[in-house]
Amino acid sequence: MSDRQIKGILGTKLGMTQVFDDQNRVVPVTVVQAGPNVVTQIRTPEKDGYSAVQLAFGAIDPRKVNKPRTGHFTKAGVTPRRHVVELRTADAGEYEVGQEVTAEVFEAGTVVDVVGTSKGKGFAGTMKRHGFRGQGASHGTQAVHRKPGSIGGCATPGRVFKGMRMSGRMGSDRVTTQNLKVHRVEGESGLLLIKGAIPGPKGGLVLVKSPAKGGA
């Protein structure tokens, strides 16, 4: 079992803006409405085989919550929430069920990973989806300007290889942007100003957590 202490919080992406640092340099930041989250369950090695903390976020009409999940929130002594995430962390025992987690779990200068769902683009061709060059614009090319070209041989190998890059649905994928720096924490308003861009549209759900690799 890992002995790493992982911090994290669910929030909503509000959009991007720019602020100034101490040297009056422009810093592009993404504003995240972080939390408040509430602890709904503590996992322990003795009972569950691993150590983790479960966080819940977002209001939801109780009538839209099924009975098993309603019972789970009732047991924790909190009102039902829309989103739930579990973080494996060695210090899960320091949390308490019902405890509130706010943006102040992070400090300015902290390096974080941000997990979100990328914007859905719908069905896209190979030029947009994979950056293919396409066919010639002239010299006898007819009605195939944006087509991918050959996808394999004929008798040999007699099939299309797995993983062939082709047209299909693009976007709406789970994306993690690693090692972003928290530029500022607005404790009273629950805002995190994270340097750089993060995945997803405005209003999208994001998870801000301790970095999986590196970080300072």
Swiss-Prot record:
Any GO BP: translation
Region (Disordered): 132-157
InterPro entries, alphabetized: Ribosomal_uL3, Ribosomal_uL3_bac/org-type, Ribosomal_uL3_CS, Transl_B-barrel_sf
Keyword list, A-Z: Ribonucleoprotein, Ribosomal protein, RNA-binding, rRNA-binding
GO cellular component terms given for this protein: cytosolic large ribosomal subunit
Pfam families for the chain: Ribosomal_L3 (PF00297)
Molecular function, one GO term: structural constituent of ribosome
Disulfide bonds listed in the record: none
Subunit structure: Part of the 50S ribosomal subunit. Forms a cluster with proteins L14 and L19.
Family: Belongs to the universal ribosomal protein uL3 family.
PANTHER family, A to Z: 50S RIBOSOMAL PROTEIN L3, LARGE RIBOSOMAL SUBUNIT PROTEIN UL3C
Role played: One of the primary rRNA binding proteins, it binds directly near the 3'-end of the 23S rRNA, where it nucleates assembly of the 50S subunit.
Protein name: Large ribosomal subunit protein uL3
